[in-house]
Amino acid sequence: MVVVACPNSSLVEAQMDADRSGSCSKYDYASAYSRLRSAARAAGTGVSSVLILSSPDVDSVCATRILTSLLLQDDIAHRIVPVEGYRTLLNTLSTVFAPHDNDNASSSSSSTTDVKSVVFINLGAVLSLPTTFNIPPSCTIHVIDSHRPWNLENLFATSHANDSVWCWDDGEIATKLCRQGGERDAFEKLEFDVDSDSESDSDSHSDSHSDSVSDPEDASDSNDSGSDSARSHDERQRDGSGGKRKRGSHSPLSRRRQRHKQGQRHKPRHRSTSASATRLTNAERHRYRNILTRYYARGESFGMSVSSMLYLLCESLGRADRESLWLAIVGLTSLYLSNNIDLETYETYSAAYASEVIAIEPTSSNAPTEAWSLDLLTNANNNAQEQAARSATATATGAARAQNRAVRSVISKNTKAEDADDRSIRIVGSELRLTLYRHWSLETAMYHTAYVAAKLGIWRERGLSKLRGLMAKMGFSLTAVRQNYTHMPLDLRRSLVRKLEAIAPEYGLTQLTYRGFERSLGFRTAPLGAADVVEGVSALLIGAHGIKIEVDTPGMVFASSSTTPLGNSFGANLNPANPNAQTSELFATKRVWNLGTALTDSITSAIGAATGNAWSNDQTEANGGLHVDVSSTQPALAAVASVQDVGALERAERRVATSNFYEAYRALDFSRSTSVDLLRSSVLLSEALHRKIVARGISLITNQSIRTLKNFRLAILRDGADLELFTHVDVLARLADWLTTSLRDIIVQQQASTNAQRKKQPAASTRLPFILAALHRAKDTFLVLGSTASAIDGVVQHNHFTAAFQHAASVSRARVRHDHFRTCSIHVRTSDLAAFVENVHLKIK
């Protein structure tokens, strides 16, 4: 094992255990990068020896940007490959590594490959890499991932292959997993237990826990029939002798049996006689296994953002600059806005980033203070007055005044754009928790914010009346709040935060602000908040290509595609009929988003072929138990696509996902005017996506399409003009977040009422599990996603649906495919959905 220790920084408050620091932190980020750089230079010039595999999310794109900037500074040739799922990951690495079951090709492959370093960005932590890939001895895999839990095989196994896997720690491994009596001790005790391999009861016990500790990517798709063309990657992993599918268990016993079959390279190295010749009692063995089982049963969660980890690398190398800091801020904000980290964690990191901003930005003595920073100055004044009141001496009063002046000076120097070329980062003390409020009208932004929807119930007429009443109490007219934010009267914008904080609590809106950041982009556009950048980049990852969606174009736009690829307003104002023509809009209108028609047309034709050239499918299987009705989908599924058509559709989807990643990557290049224009236009696409998501969520609530079961709530999306959009896992996850947030207060009240009737003590931390299923007509599958929210706003619960989905697929023998890095999502055949959901219902407690 090689664990890359997290460097000391203001971003990391982890305290290393002195007893275990030597074994857990032999290398740090800088030494890991130095190894990568040395291997690249040893490979020679003109050789692309670094392969970067990145998952398609905002944090990963930001981290990839930071890493590639370092590689470019060092003149290291590299290649970026977006990886949207496990099958793409295996297909990509199959061109680099030899097949795992081909022992004869192992040496030849390792000697001929030019790739010396493979960097996994936001993927790989849950995989057992040494048993999944045949890693050449000359190649090193760097795992930089925020997904948790870790696969302990990568961290603590002692095979020779594990020496090629370098896992970058964010502090959790050294402080938690390596603590005395923790997961590392349990793993090592079981790995070197001399009797564990020979005892049949040990094997059966390990297998009995496979549903709760198995790899998320190793879905229970062994029940899938041979006619299903969409196989997950683990189904194609066969051992050479028996053809039996390898288990994806995290159990060290089952992993060790795999290594024994895979040859000498994967045999454990005995460190010493005392360490290897250990005989455990049955009680000890049971206790250590329980430690590992509890670790994997915690559910899916997130650690430090990968962009923050790469920023720490920049700090360690002395290369931290404004661009890397801004990308790290955007990556952190993306985790917070997607409810992957809680408010307390975000506040801790954002405070550290605020200090970095103050330290890294140039100063200006004549920069006036912006209106939205007045709350910071007010807090500074209050703190100074309190300090002066507590002290009776003039010295203390003078010190308080000096501190006040210093804070005022720092804020003024970091909160105002100086000139047309200013690209500084500014701290926003009270960033409004409203969706795209800088680009929408205030009323529209509040309407599309899930937190506001939860408190006011905007899907009811009464909720809309409350929203307008809130505006009236603030002294804002309907005309003003329906204007674009940039067109609102200046005095209203300056007083917006103060009035919201004073009046909104009367409506239950007590957490409408948080610490945020803004970036000035000079004369090209108005300053963009970190949340705005997150929304825009996320929209590009979802729909830059491949979907047809209408966006609102602003008025008074005159665009020419001859000057830039898409004119001044990019995809919003491109005329698809005549791309070379001048286009103009005097008044706001709707246009189809378009960054080029080739990929979108390929998806459309593939879907048409999959649904048109198919054979009849009669659904005769009875659905019992929960009676999940799938019969209504049959008219639309009069035909089921052939294997070839589905394969063509999936290849088209992969091309679209790759192109979307590169568009998002390009949008974060703030040195290019075209990239800034693309990022600005992506906000229009994000607005359109939010409209679709909120409209679908309100439709589910008002039509009472959400079923309340004993242990979770269930909603099935079977129809609608925008149904295809919700087969994208990120869009479905956004809808799930909106529903859980919007219904939080209602669900908590219902649970409190039920507990009162039963005279039951309410739980200290109530989870709000939600399952959404979206029909993909062309593939005859449902995309099923599980979401877990907390009853307390700002608190994040671990997601336990991964193990529940695996267990349900195994018990129900449903045909499923688990191909997303979001482990709480899975594809289920339409005819198997009822049995699958019923078994999930029995598993979730």
Curated annotation (Swiss-Prot):
Write down the superkingdom of origin: Eukaryota
Q: Mark out the compositionally biased spans (Basic and acidic residues).
A: 202-212, 230-242
- Which keywords belong to this entry? Cell cycle, DNA replication, Nucleus
The leader peptide range reads: none
> Where does it reside?
Nucleus
GO MF annotation, one: DNA replication origin binding
One of the Pfam families matching this protein, by short name: CDC45
Task: Give the start-end ranges of region Disordered.
Answer: 193-283
Q: Name one GO biological process term.
A: DNA replication initiation
Bias category Basic residues: which stretches? 243-272
Show the GO cellular component annotation of the record. DNA replication preinitiation complex
Similarity field: Belongs to the CDC45 family.
In UniProt terms, what function does this protein have?
A: Temperature-sensitive protein required for DNA synthesis. May be a transcription factor that regulates the level or influences the stability of DNA polymerases or auxiliary proteins.
Protein name, UniProt field: Protein TSD2
What organism does this protein naturally occur in?
Mycosarcoma maydis (Corn smut fungus)
